[in-house]
Amino acid sequence: MSEPNEGGSSYRSGGNYNGYKPSGNRYQPNSNNRGPPRYRSNHRQDGGYYNNGGYHQQQGYGYGQPTHAHGVQRQTYRGGSYHPYQHSDSRYGSNSTYRRPYGQQSVPPAPPPSTASSVSSSSAYSRGSNVLPVSRNSYPSPKYEQPKKKFTIPKDENPFIYMMSNDDHSRTSKLKEVYKENDQIDNKLEELKLKIFKDELELGLMSTQCEKDALNVQLTQEKLDSLLMN
């Protein structure tokens, strides 16, 4: 025998309580309990509460579609009915300071090439000319300059002539002659000095030899005197 219940369902002994099913859960009390279901508290751990045999859940859940940040149609279960709604992301579009996540930021496109350079390059290649098109940022090539040869002073000339930086050719030639004569005189003096040194060395050797000869004569004279005395 079934008894009327507040939720409009029937409860049989030994069977299941087929009441209102808010989220697919089923309440099975003991078989000895014939009265309406009793609960210790109206609140649940998941945030819902019971009222007049019905279950009201405060937190919305999405069915059929994943949860996204912007513009996704979701369905929530509130008070025993489903209320689909469309979440608008107009506040993100109107706000200029909103930034997308790091991996979704759009890269600005590269600037298009200038029309003047593209037209000139295409016209140059279409005419079949061998000259490459000149770009806007090209610079003229530097002129080739042959390196200047370094002036070397001859060995037989005095370097002081060129240090005076005299542009007069006649005077420069006279200076060259004067310095040349000076060099010749210096060379002769060096030769004379060398000759004098040789003569002094020979004189010293001769004097030493004379001393040796004088000692030899003295020794021989002493020997003769000793023989005569005997």
Curated annotation (Swiss-Prot):
Q: Is Magnesium given among the entry's keywords?
A: no
Q: Which cysteines are joined by disulfide bonds?
A: none
Q: Which InterPro entries match?
A: Tscrpt_reg_Lge1 (IPR021581)
For bias type Low complexity, the affected ranges are 1-20, 47-60, 115-126
A single cellular component GO annotation: nucleus
Question: Any idea which UniProt keywords this protein has?
Answer: Activator, Chromatin regulator, Coiled coil, Nucleus, Transcription, Transcription regulation
- Compartment annotation: Nucleus
Has keyword Glycoprotein? Answer: no
Predominant location of this chain? nucleus
Ranges in coiled-coil conformation: 172-203
Q: Pfam families attached here?
A: Lge1 (PF11488)
Q: Where is the composition biased (Polar residues)?
A: 25-34
Which GO BP terms sit in this record? Answer: chromatin organization
Region annotation Disordered: where it falls in the sequence: 1-150
Q: What does this protein do?
A: Involved in transcriptional activation. Also required for ubiquitination of histone H2B to form H2BK123ub1. H2BK123ub1 gives a specific tag for epigenetic transcriptional activation, telomeric silencing, and is also a prerequisite for H3K4me and H3K79me formation. Its precise role in H2BK123ub1 formation however is unclear.
> Under which name does UniProt file this protein?
Transcriptional regulatory protein LGE1
Organism equals: Kluyveromyces lactis (strain ATCC 8585 / CBS 2359 / DSM 70799 / NBRC 1267 / NRRL Y-1140 / WM37)
Gene assigned in the entry: LGE1
